[in-house]
């Protein structure tokens, strides 16, 4: 509905994340691999002009990503912003297997406790569609998933069934917090990443 009713429209694709960190490079990789055409859309009679931006992370720029995006949006005046980012999973099975879609924007870094200003319509001034893919999982989640499988296994045993019953009374959140408390401090904030395969971009293939 954002661009369907317009004869011509501009879309800004925002690739969030650190291109130098494999599991956080999803956003920049998407921008690298999409067809950017805004610079010749008018001459070519293209209906939807696509621009791309990979602003990096605050540690690289010293600026909030939202500040950079707001400045670009003010100049570019896109009809809609599509933000792509890596997410932290709360279930190991979701790594690289699920996609989260939202029309409410996105808050970079929130999945790993690194809270930054959100990329939302209220902040940047245009509608924001967010696409997220889980690419990292923390150590407590891996331990929790392992424990869940272990408890399912011992539930089949008459002698150990009572142990499984005790833990079944805990909610998933309570189990996760319990594991965070007993796991070593060095492991609590450790994240495991998935390798993302990156194919040559259209621009690389054209040699430009």
Residues covered by each model-derived region:
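Extended, charged alpha/beta regions that create polyanion-binding interfaces
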Residues: 1-9
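Glycine-rich phosphate/diphosphate-binding loop of Rossmann-like nucleotide-binding domains
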Residues: 18-46
